[in-house]
Amino acid sequence: MSNMLKFGIPKGSLENATVELFKKSGWQVSISSRSYFPGIDDSEMTCKLIRPQEMGRYVERATIDAGIAGRDWVSENQSDVVEVCEMVYSKVSRRPARWVLVANGDSNVKGPEDLAGATIATELVGFTKRYFSERNIPVNVEFSWGATEAKVVDGLCDAIVEVTETGSTIKANGLRIVCELMESVPVLIANKASWADPWKREKIEQIATLLKSSLAAENMVGLKMNAPGDKVEAITSVLPSLKNATVSHLYNSDWLSIESVMSEKEVRRVIPELIKLGAEGIIEYPLNKII
Amino acid sequence: MSNMLKFGIPKGSLENATVELFKKSGWQVSISSRSYFPGIDDSEMTCKLIRPQEMGRYVERATIDAGIAGRDWVSENQSDVVEVCEMVYSKVSRRPARWVLVANGDSNVKGPEDLAGATIATELVGFTKRYFSERNIPVNVEFSWGATEAKVVDGLCDAIVEVTETGSTIKANGLRIVCELMESVPVLIANKASWADPWKREKIEQIATLLKSSLAAENMVGLKMNAPGDKVEAITSVLPSLKNATVSHLYNSDWLSIESVMSEKEVRRVIPELIKLGAEGIIEYPLNKII
Amino acid sequence: MSNMLKFGIPKGSLENATVELFKKSGWQVSISSRSYFPGIDDSEMTCKLIRPQEMGRYVERATIDAGIAGRDWVSENQSDVVEVCEMVYSKVSRRPARWVLVANGDSNVKGPEDLAGATIATELVGFTKRYFSERNIPVNVEFSWGATEAKVVDGLCDAIVEVTETGSTIKANGLRIVCELMESVPVLIANKASWADPWKREKIEQIATLLKSSLAAENMVGLKMNAPGDKVEAITSVLPSLKNATVSHLYNSDWLSIESVMSEKEVRRVIPELIKLGAEGIIEYPLNKII
Amino acid sequence: MSNMLKFGIPKGSLENATVELFKKSGWQVSISSRSYFPGIDDSEMTCKLIRPQEMGRYVERATIDAGIAGRDWVSENQSDVVEVCEMVYSKVSRRPARWVLVANGDSNVKGPEDLAGATIATELVGFTKRYFSERNIPVNVEFSWGATEAKVVDGLCDAIVEVTETGSTIKANGLRIVCELMESVPVLIANKASWADPWKREKIEQIATLLKSSLAAENMVGLKMNAPGDKVEAITSVLPSLKNATVSHLYNSDWLSIESVMSEKEVRRVIPELIKLGAEGIIEYPLNKII
Amino acid sequence: MSNMLKFGIPKGSLENATVELFKKSGWQVSISSRSYFPGIDDSEMTCKLIRPQEMGRYVERATIDAGIAGRDWVSENQSDVVEVCEMVYSKVSRRPARWVLVANGDSNVKGPEDLAGATIATELVGFTKRYFSERNIPVNVEFSWGATEAKVVDGLCDAIVEVTETGSTIKANGLRIVCELMESVPVLIANKASWADPWKREKIEQIATLLKSSLAAENMVGLKMNAPGDKVEAITSVLPSLKNATVSHLYNSDWLSIESVMSEKEVRRVIPELIKLGAEGIIEYPLNKII
Amino acid sequence: MSNMLKFGIPKGSLENATVELFKKSGWQVSISSRSYFPGIDDSEMTCKLIRPQEMGRYVERATIDAGIAGRDWVSENQSDVVEVCEMVYSKVSRRPARWVLVANGDSNVKGPEDLAGATIATELVGFTKRYFSERNIPVNVEFSWGATEAKVVDGLCDAIVEVTETGSTIKANGLRIVCELMESVPVLIANKASWADPWKREKIEQIATLLKSSLAAENMVGLKMNAPGDKVEAITSVLPSLKNATVSHLYNSDWLSIESVMSEKEVRRVIPELIKLGAEGIIEYPLNKII
């Protein structure tokens, strides 16, 4: 169908964050437990919920035109697709996912080389095999159907390659990270033919722009204050240089209004300084998007 | 009691949305599971929780001065009240409620006329009787105590008249919408004597204005950007014409600040154009009310 | 450790509100069910979760430098600490906690003096003993391990001293408030030595300023509108005088933009007047902080 | 269809108890949230879930052959059906449902006669009208769509006729029972033609026998013990006379085994006496059915 | 370790049923959310929770001595293990799991042969490939990471091979079962060396006997009654012949006590007959095990 | 009041187990969230829900006649009451509660003597003070308001005295049990005057007998089988000697029926032997009470 873009929402751990991100970007995606088809309020798009593990396969095959999934799975399947951009979900709890090599807390494994001859369980069989084979370490890699951490706790294998954000589940199970093998962030990928189609490419780029504007606004706020004319320079100099402050005259007065955008963390530092410099009527307000 | 307005909050499907709407409009309504009386932080108002089916009855009788309920139930009871305004809860999931005629998916019913002699179950007995009688189709309409869809599935009746938003529950049960009989939206209704009392009328109008301002702001956002003076006209011409943009000078510069209000959907269209036209420092911020 | 502030988050009824308050103030505090240590995204701070009953003890002893707890418990333990400021969680549901003397609904107790010789159960044993002893009323005060209301219902004691916000639980149990003994609000307290240390004091004051800015913004909103030049005076005179309105020229026009901050309740009153005075394009937007 | 019985399970408050009762009686009824049709593992029966308010209507009309519903609703609708037997769900929490006349706790209503001219809200409009009309008390009875207790609390009506088991919800709302108007128990009802059909009647009677056997076994247990021959008479005389005890010889001994059935409450009384009389090896075991 | 049996509990859909089955058989298995190791109150056993998909692998490799898993997965992996016995979880809701070929409800697929050239998604890749290859039907079988039904709904593949008990989820999604490919029941499997070890084999057989005794007792009950001597033959002839009835003399009487075991369904048939034949004091009691 | 016994149910961790135990013993105790008074279906008893920490206080003072609480708390308060009997809740998960001395996992504390001068937090202040003072170890014991484990993790104190069943929470927090200070089981205690009153004492003893009979039946089952006359001696010799087996003649046969009571664990051992010895028709049935 021409002028219709088929987009893949990643099912599972990124699902809610992606729906929320679309919402902030102006699209209502509705996922119902009664239906596998997510709805979207854009007559030029349809959505499908797709496992991250399979996103690359379906984008490559043009079942969908574009979609979001972790780079780990896109590369695991060695899918032949276009990577449009990274989508760094920047909230504190959204550190990059790290694939790590994990052994029992009391084992003697110091590095990958200590695992020659061992059995390693993982969901990421292809990547793990390539990783050890590139280092000429002979290992037996086998597919794990989930609960992978339990396997090394239980002695069902010698080590695992598992994904983690903070490492806390691993520690809580008495396991130990031997080393990190790969970091992964979500990426927006597109089918090659779709990317070559001008209408589809513009649509994909529109989506990418708006999603990234919403991500950029996470943890960012607007700060607005009034200041006497002779303090404006001092005040603007303590504001973060991310964007130039917007300064405008006030009516019947030599005061000015100053407005700027910064992260919540910078606000913590800036406000005590602004007070000292004589800014008044300081207010902070929330932002939806920063372009 | 003079200078005290008694207001009816609709119990049930509109209850939470109404409480949230009052909150956005500046009133805290607190509904406790321990008490039937909702509290409200306005010394000139008291609230009662009332079933939509009975709202008209109690407003007509002056038990309460005004209230919100679906127009379907107000008209079912043919209550003699003033309809002050519609309250279109505009979120995507809040399409108008539709009362539809529903038959089994595999029945031969093509229209109301195919139901002559049939038994029809519904909660809206009065409306349904009037509908069929106006068309001279003899039917047996009987009151259904809920789970109305089950009745036609189970063969307990030939068809039903039931309310739906999206039709998905009906389809999921293997039923089929024959035709739509009525669309209904929530309305704010007032007792006739209360409406004639100047103080009460002003109070009711204040409530109506603020609730509508909050509804108008749903899915709307503010967009602010800086632009060189010679681009202002081009930029303002791509902004939706809902409200004129607010344009002001920036300090010590020939740039201007442009600020406008639009729906989230328009933002999707507008932002790529603004970037092309040279707007900078574009930010989007949320709104509570638009008057 | 120098340049490191140890801060106590109150466990229990104020816990979520405090974490949310820090979030609004620019700090992410993460409390995990797997760990007793809340994390905080500030390299100059560590947090501990501490019962309000024990906060004074640990601040006094310098186990932590500062913390938030109800003034009731700080004074119960007669802890020797600095009270930096009150933290009035101002939302409607956050009235000051009141410690009240409670008896059975049908008892004859009119005032504390009617309880001579009686047994009184309470969690606040020290305060209650001092209260009755100052009034020369001999009573037997005993520590209650919770479910204190049940004790007077059950006849296990003659009266209780219990904390309440609205009194509704007390009434629901058929009990009666005899009189109020003390009102309590949360306070930010600091260890005396920490307060004397310049770096720690500045850090504590930074926290206090930002938390109070966030509290000040609760239930407050920004209102922005355009007005013809000759209406500005009339319009600004109906705005609440909390902060001066910010007024600025519009481009190529004799209209002005007016912006002000007020409580949601004032908005209810002001908007009908602004409309009458000719204001246009009125929008209301949310605030995070007011300094 | 011949040799097929259509049976109505009451939807709502009796639903789970009825399904459990069928289970104890040897039938697996499966109610799925995905389907309106309950399944049953008996090739001679089909089930439907039907509101108690409508059970009489559908049995009378032969839509179903038989069903269980409260006698209150069967009589409200004055359905022309056969009442096969009462089904007294005997667990402690299953007291007969009582329809009571309820007024505000502080009203002066002493009896029905004090309500002349009043408005009474109830779900049981027909019964209530007949009740007051038989006593020549003119009242305005109106249908209540639920939350009936709230109506008298809220002053929407003068009194209500409502169903209750223990009266505790009524008391908790500050209301008062004026008097009881009717007691209701579940009944098994049958269509008149179905009852006249020999095969259907035998099937209905089989169901009635087994359901009643299961109900009879609720709170009943079996008690078994050994006793010397000369104590048998004394022991059997303290056992409840509900059923004769089963006494049998033991092998190579002059001891006897005694076995009897009684309620759990009688066990509390009997066991201390049995110990005194020299019974040994006393065990208590659970029962499923007593015929 | 000698005299220690390592046993695999299947994680997932059979997990709770298996724990409950061990409980009925006299073993307390405790699965904690804090630990991957289930505990068991038998000093001769340890347990591990293992995915059914991997059970065969770990039993074959002697990581565990024995375990329970569906025969589908044991055969998928072509594990070289001993199948000790079937474990037919006989409750109504536990029909054998069926692997079925599923296509869209409105497709033209009538049998496997209509799928030549198609893409089939399944978790059971090995079995599916063998199935089609034995029939010389060329298909592309690909591994599905779950939500397999969604794939055919969504058009991501042409057909799926999926497991189902009742087919109701398939129907609810608008899909259609083309044909059944395999039925699967849980089996108890053992490692070959463990089975050759006399102590381990005896232990495995003890477990098998007790688990099967508990399964045999599901839906079975004991029935006990008294009867006059001349009715015993008639009565015992209507009892199911599963086990001989136990008949014993009553003390000082020519009545006899008759006791037998049967399924709950047979009780429905038998009780009306027993009453007609003069049996008295009929009671039904629950059973834990039948050997 | 004469002939009325006031009984205390322990609120909290033993609450549900106690209510269930009373239910098995023939008393329905109903605890409602709307009321502090548990109901009981015995016209000679009333119940109160009381914290274990306060049970001794109220029994000593005759506010109640008897109650159940942990011996730890009865002795903490040094209440002057009669201990009627232990109530060993024997289910696997109900090991005796142990009060243990706990330090950080990596501390050097080997025994109580290493804590001279330390601060110890505990809910059991009196016992802990006595324990250390008897050993002449000077420590600072302070009352902990809950979350005691967090205190030693957080460094708020040097060690804690805390209750545990399995030690797993302690280990999960990285703490270490230094030694056990006391084991505690629930006890049934009585007021001294109540115990001296013949009617009350008999009532208390009746309760004690029935509760203990129910506890004795936990994890116990009945086993029944038929055997040829010449195998009876061999068979009864393998049965546990807890109670003599009940053996009776079968009608018109030289077989005998054998019935015995044993624990579920013994059944695991016994059944394979019974099969070898020729027993037939073995069934196992559940028990409610063993006296």
UniProtKB/Swiss-Prot annotation, chains A, B, C, D, E, F:
It catalyses: 1-(5-phospho-beta-D-ribosyl)-ATP + diphosphate = 5-phospho-alpha-D-ribose 1-diphosphate + ATP. GO terms for molecular function: ATP binding; ATP phosphoribosyltransferase activity; magnesium ion binding. Pfam families: HisG, HisG_C. Pathway: Amino-acid biosynthesis; L-histidine biosynthesis; L-histidine from 5-phospho-alpha-D-ribose 1-diphosphate: step 1/9. This is ATP phosphoribosyltransferase. Its EC number is 2.4.2.17. Keywords: Amino-acid biosynthesis, ATP-binding, Cytoplasm, Glycosyltransferase, Histidine biosynthesis, Magnesium, Metal-binding, Nucleotide-binding, Transferase. Belongs to the ATP phosphoribosyltransferase family. Long subfamily. Disulfide bonds: none annotated. It comes from the Bacteria. The keyword Cell division does not apply. Catalyzes the condensation of ATP and 5-phosphoribose 1-diphosphate to form N'-(5'-phosphoribosyl)-ATP (PR-ATP). Has a crucial role in the pathway because the rate of histidine biosynthesis seems to be controlled primarily by regulation of HisG enzymatic activity. GO terms for cellular component: cytoplasm. Its cofactor is Mg(2+). InterPro entries: ATP-PRT_HisG_long (IPR020621), ATP_PRibTrfase_cat (IPR013820), ATP_PRibTrfase_HisG (IPR001348), HisG_C (IPR013115), N-reg_PII-like_a/b (IPR011322), N-reg_PII/ATP_PRibTrfase_C (IPR015867). It comes from Pelobacter propionicus (strain DSM 2379 / NBRC 103807 / OttBd1). HAMAP family: HisG_Long. The keyword Amino-acid biosynthesis applies. One of its GO terms (biological process) is L-histidine biosynthetic process. The gene is hisG. It is found in: Cytoplasm. Feedback inhibited by histidine.
